[in-house]
Amino acid sequence: MGETGDARWSPELLAKMVQWLEDAYPCEGCGLVVETDGEGWEFRACDNVIDKYHELDPETYPRTSRDFYMIDPRAFMKAEDRGEDVVVIVHSHPDAGDYFSDADVEAALMPRPGAEDPVEPLYPGSDYLVVSIRDGKAQSASLYRFDEATREFEKVEGLDAQVLREGISDTERCEVSA
């Protein structure tokens, strides 16, 4: 899990992902990239459920889909039931850059109070892709990976990131069903 081979970011996967994220604008869109057969990747569009939580308990969940995302935990369970590995967790930043925000980091880590190592990735081995959507159109994307040595999320540099950026900006739009 977490390996981002260039061939796996197919034009079809990128087109479906970008269309879903653009359609979510001006809210944050989200989804999962899953490995389906040991080789191929597919995009699974997910509803951003943060507004439901905010409506029920605004004190505990003060943010809304305009500036935060929450994937229904059942999406992860469904992927596991289908025998799929979640390799990338995707979300967009409406009218903002493709950075991994403090809120993104907090949501991606599982605190372990009193443990020798106080943080652990919530989904070990999964990378995070943040896509900047400005005025409803995908502009750029950056991939982030948990570094075991630094115990922090680091931006993935190199060919994978370049392929993604080029793929996002050159993607032909297609229809996608939820």
Name these PLM-found stretches:
Residues 1-86, 94-178:
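Conserved beta-strand-loop surface patch within small alpha/beta domains used
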